Amino acid sequence: MNEFENLLSRDLEFAQNKSNRIMICLCIDCSASMLLQGAMKKVNDGMEAFLEKTNNDTLARDAADICIVSFGDTAQLVSDFGTADEALHNLHAHPILPVGANTVLAAGVNMTLELLAVHQKQLEAVNNNAYIPWLIIIS
């Protein structure tokens, strides 16, 4: 899906789903330290369980806008704001794997905050009230 189609899809979703949104930003450490004691696998399993439970709950599914950012040597967008189902699909398509020796936590948090500010403006533009966003950092 190209950027234009993605925007149209989001506009359609905003028009059809009038639920107040809760923006949930998962900021995930994928530095080499996450190899210790299988930490990365536990994080991926936990995110998958969270996304599946969110997707299976009607109220949560309609309200949750989920974004996933990973950070190791660099910060990377894994899944832009969307449904739990979209985030799960993106997580399966681009699994978070431990890479690099550095942990650029600030870069990951800054990217997440920038994405959050943009998405908050998108919601305001369609008069959608949003709850206070969650920023969850796993390191």
Regions found by a protein language model. Name each.
Residues 1-9, 62-72, 107-111:
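Short, mixed-charge, low-aromatic patches
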Residues 1-25, 30-41, 118-128:
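Acidic, polar low-complexity linker/tail segments
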Residues 79-89:
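Short, flexible, mixed-charge acidic loops at enzyme active sites
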Residues 25-31, 89-96:
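A short small-residue
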Residues 26-31, 43, 68, 112, ...:
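DG-centered beta-turn motif at the end of beta-strands
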